[in-house]
Amino acid sequence: MKNRLKVLRAERDWTQAKLAEELEVSRQTINAIEKGKFDPSLPLAFKAARLFAMTIEEIFEGD
């Protein structure tokens, strides 16, 4: 799954650790999602969408 997490995080000058803290997950989870090795759960995708004030579709895109 492609996603814009890394770009959105960089626009805010956030580290992976900061984003992980905001989403209440581990830094390793953020790393895996950004690299496309892990697809976020639906609750996590909703949480990210709320955090960035975007829709899930604007952040995550299926392959």
Question: Which positions does each model-derived feature cover?
Answer:
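Residues in the recognition helix of alpha-helical DNA-binding motifs
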Residues: E22, I33, G62
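DNA major-groove recognition helix of helix-turn-helix/homeodomain DNA-binding modules
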Residues: P43-E58
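Short basic helix-loop element that most often maps to the first helix and adjoining turn
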Residues: N3-E22
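Recognition helix of helix-turn-helix/homeodomain-like DNA-binding domains
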Residues: V25-F38
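Residues in the helix-turn-helix
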Residues: K18, T29, E58
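Short, charged recognition helix plus adjacent turn
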Residues: E11, R50, F60-D63
